């Protein structure tokens, strides 16, 4: 989601600016575009086959038998992790082989490949960086419809719920994260987060000065793992 032409995205030039800039005036995504050295495909190859989402601890990454180019990639990812830890964040570096879908998801899938917002009871942001593979996508709030506001979807969930459309139903929607998922409006174009760009995006929390950033993980294809940093 390049900052160019995106009123909800602000582009920054450094990590310090990314960390310190406050969300305001409708801007709910900050992007530090950059290039990083190294061979990230080699890192994935050395990790070998896997399933689902595999967290990569520092020791495993350092222990990989890599060429100098692969080592540059590994050290760049480890440096990003340490940078976030130094600022009291809890990053996780993952090799995403595939996003596991809930077979009992029901009427509205609520996995990360559906456009959604992140929520928290207190002020907190989501940090994202894709090093290799398909990247996450963002969707302008103006280009999105809350899925539970779409009559046919709401009716289907209400039938699944088996009760009345009242306060208890609203609580049911919240408990199952149905109120966090969105559908693109006709003609809307999702915007890619890109490779190597470090993003800080707004979540939904009480008192937030801006709407949360709507985003999703990409569909994973067999044989195309991703390297993703998230906090």
Question: Which stretches of residues belong to each language-model region?
Answer:
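Extracellular-facing segments of soluble proteins and assemblies that are Gly/Ser/Thr-biased and enriched
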Residues: 66-118
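Short helix/loop capping segments that flank catalytic or ligand/cofactor-binding pockets
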Residues: 41, 138-140, 207-208
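Catalytic core of non-heme Fe(II) oxygenases with the double-stranded beta-helix
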Residues: 111-192
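Short, structured patches in soluble enzyme cores that scaffold and shape functional sites
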Residues: 95-97, 129-132, 140, 201, ...
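Catalytic core of Fe(II)/2-oxoglutarate
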Residues: 175-231
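Short, surface-exposed beta-edge/turn micro-motifs
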Residues: 26-29, 124-127, 193-194, 225-226
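N-terminal auxiliary "cap/dimerization" subdomain that precedes the catalytic jelly-roll/cupin core
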Residues: 1-87
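A general structural signal for short secondary-structure junctions and capping/turn motifs
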Residues: 20-24, 82-85, 118-122, 128, ...
